């Protein structure tokens, strides 16, 4: 039994160092303190609250049994019941109007977004077409330059080959020019 008593006794926990009480003076200091507390133990899971659902009024009752107004003849407590029903109905109508307005604004936003997207696509297509045109123009200019270079090389080759033979031919032409043109025997 002594062994069970010894095993049930836990070792004493180490004493935590006392922390100074810091009172935040503004929202930034409060946020800083919260972050410091979270970062002391990064392994601990952080509770992230869910997004609160939007408030919606209760649906109207299926059947209203006691239809009454604020007219004379109603009991002293009936006016308060009527007032609460009226307030609830006005809240429901305001909610429906707000939701309709929100849906209308969302639809307008989506239309505007679609128009902007189409305009951006058109502008991009226009610029793409312009870039392609410039690219083709540069490619065509490059081809023309290569063709001119080939033609100039070919013409220089043709000029070099006949130029050696042209000197001999030019000598014979000079002789022909010296001879009278009326002789046709050659």
UniProtKB/Swiss-Prot annotation:
Top-level taxon of the source organism: Eukaryota
Keyword Coiled coil: yes
Cellular compartments annotated: Nucleus; Nucleus, Nucleolus
Any GO CC annotation of this UniProt entry: spliceosomal complex
Function of the protein: Required for pre-mRNA splicing as component of the spliceosome. Binds double-stranded RNA. Inhibits EIF2AK2 kinase activity.
The family this protein is said to belong to: Belongs to the PRKRIP1 family.
Quaternary organization: Component of the pre-catalytic and post-catalytic spliceosome complexes. Interacts with EIF2AK2.
This protein's name: PRKR-interacting protein 1
């Amino acid at each position: 039994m002594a062994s069970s008593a010894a095993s049930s006794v836990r070792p004493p926990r180490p004493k935590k160092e006392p922390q100074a009480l810091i009172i935040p003076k503004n929202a930034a200091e409060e946020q800083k303190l919260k972050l410091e507390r979270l970062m002391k133990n990064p392994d601990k899971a952080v509770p992230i609250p869910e997004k609160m659902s939007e408030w919606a009024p209760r649906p109207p009752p299926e059947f209203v049994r006691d239809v009454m107004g604020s007219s004379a003849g109603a009991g002293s407590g009936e006016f308060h019941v009527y007032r609460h029903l009226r307030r609830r109905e006005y809240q429901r109508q305001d909610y429906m109007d707000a939701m309709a307005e929100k849906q209308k604004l969302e639809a307008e936003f989506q239309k505007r977004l679609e128009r902007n997207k189409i305009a951006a696509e058109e502008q991009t297509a226009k610029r793409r077409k312009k870039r392609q045109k410039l690219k083709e123009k540069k490619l065509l200019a490059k081809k023309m330059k290569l063709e001119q270079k080939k033609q100039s090389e070919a013409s220089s080759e043709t000029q070099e080959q006949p130029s050696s033979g042209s000197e001999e031919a030019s000598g014979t032409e000079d002789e022909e020019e010296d001879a009278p043109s009326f002789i046709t025997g050659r």
